[in-house]
């Protein structure tokens, strides 16, 4: 029997606010444990939560970017459960009346086709604290710094049918929330976490199978590996006549497997009820319009503009717009020097710069070569001061911190030889010293032109303009 995976994702996105969702405590990452938790975060008697307006604005911003509806009001509810890092004994979340409803996000599959993934809802909630078990003898520690940090939980429809589609959706969502400034979405810091709901059903059937939920997967690769393992696990059980247990599972990256944590809770297990300390949130059309007017250019809008304005290939556009920081870097280079061909800038950013960043595990915001320095280098390539190979040499020197392109060119004597008279003298010598190859070229072996150009490049220590040399040889031969 052929089985079809049915996958839905719940993504927890930490909102980019200076303070927490219901208190004035800071949300900065990396502070000493329990130094950013106030009485409200700890749920001490007599305190009352006050909603952070910026969190509401960011949630609405996300909703508009995925073509969702923003209801006129939403309600906060208490989600009741016990866990040591949940100080109040309940989490303030949203249940029946979320702030964002019925949106969608289009993804591009590996074969180039587009698929629309529905977004059921996105709701605001507070994060819990964090438990620590390692390095503690006989006890666990709790850091409440994260408690009360604003989260937007984004729940997809069960429209995903493979691990590849799940990763494509996550990457598109990750890119979007960074583009619109909703979140830094730093996965290493837990600002973008994913729960995977997965079930199998016979291909062609409409009825859903029993699902398992894999909690808190924090990398694209781990999501893919967890889904592939879970599909095989459930398939093996079903084909051997067993039944799938509805449960919560954990992905173990070391063993590359999912393990059972507990049976899966239903909504009634959490005893949701409206939080009496918080009024319903009214969201008027004026507020929505104000947020809409502040929406930045969305990723798919930027891709369309790049292709039209800069005449770039889909491949180049896709690489340049993967991250907003890369797109901004590219456009900054072109704004600094309008004589630089966009294709030249795209080639260097997607090629040499990307390779150097990956090799050193750096983001483009950490690049030792800023946009102004790269623009200086590309200007010298565009005006034929440097050949492509010489440009690479300058790039490597610049990466090492030796200054801008002009300084390096002057210091190392790297200026390209473009003087026609000087080049013709060298070309004449090459022709005189290689009569056999000249005869072969004239009898039809056109590929020998590369040999002649190579001889000139060798004689000039790579400083000749290879295109110019090529043209001069063809004239003389």
UniProtKB/Swiss-Prot annotation:
Any matching Pfam family: GatB_Yqey
SMART domains xrefs: GatB_Yqey (SM00845)
EC code: 6.3.5.-
Coiled coil: none
Function per UniProt: Allows the formation of correctly charged Asn-tRNA(Asn) or Gln-tRNA(Gln) through the transamidation of misacylated Asp-tRNA(Asn) or Glu-tRNA(Gln) in organisms which lack either or both of asparaginyl-tRNA or glutaminyl-tRNA synthetases. The reaction takes place in the presence of glutamine and ATP through an activated phospho-Asp-tRNA(Asn) or phospho-Glu-tRNA(Gln).
Record NCBIfam families: gatB (TIGR00133), PRK05477.1-2 (NF004012), PRK05477.1-4 (NF004014), PRK05477.1-5 (NF004015)
Subunit structure: Heterotrimer of A, B and C subunits.
Family: Belongs to the GatB/GatE family. GatB subfamily.
Protein name, entry field: Aspartyl/glutamyl-tRNA(Asn/Gln) amidotransferase subunit B
Organism per entry: Coxiella burnetii (strain Dugway 5J108-111)
